[in-house]
Amino acid sequence: MIKNIWNKPIKRFTLIVLVSCILSFILYGPFLYQFITKGIVFSGSGDGFRQMMPFQMHLYEHFTSLKGFYDASFGLGGDYVKSLAYYYSLSPLMWINFSMIWILEQTINVNPHDISFWTINQLIMAYVRSVITFIFSFYLFSYLRLKPAPMF
């Protein structure tokens, strides 16, 4: 049965995505549990990770309001896209994420202007990145045709 699925590219891709989703869910299970029970996202309250949520919210608000790249409210004024490029502003996943958030904001009235929204968004995006990483890694290792190394 597995061989039958494996020989058809669409079914193989579906199986790889399904396995990647399951593995990612197992990987992020403890983080989801901590978030649900304690309200902690990935680590603690003083983590640098918490800096990224306001940065994401700031970028989202500027991109959706179609403001220019220079903003006087960013520190002493500056190019926020260049300054936040290391974090998010040039990531293709960020653009897709912001597009989906904007669509959800317009259709089902989610509130991305509240900082608590971005904690949930961080968990979802971390899960999505993990699934994508598993899929790309599988295809990369298949392309490289790695053979098992002898133990001794």
Feature map (PLM): residue ranges:
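Hydrophobic transmembrane helix bundles of membrane-integrated enzymes that assemble
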Residues: 18, 127, 134, 149-151
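Transmembrane-helix signature of polytopic, membrane-embedded enzymes
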Residues: 137-152
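Start-transfer (signal-anchor) and selected internal transmembrane alpha helices
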Residues: 1-34
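Membrane-interface coil-to-helix junctions
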Residues: 24-134
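Membrane-interfacial loop-to-helix junctions in multi-pass inner-membrane proteins
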Residues: 10-11, 113-117, 144-148
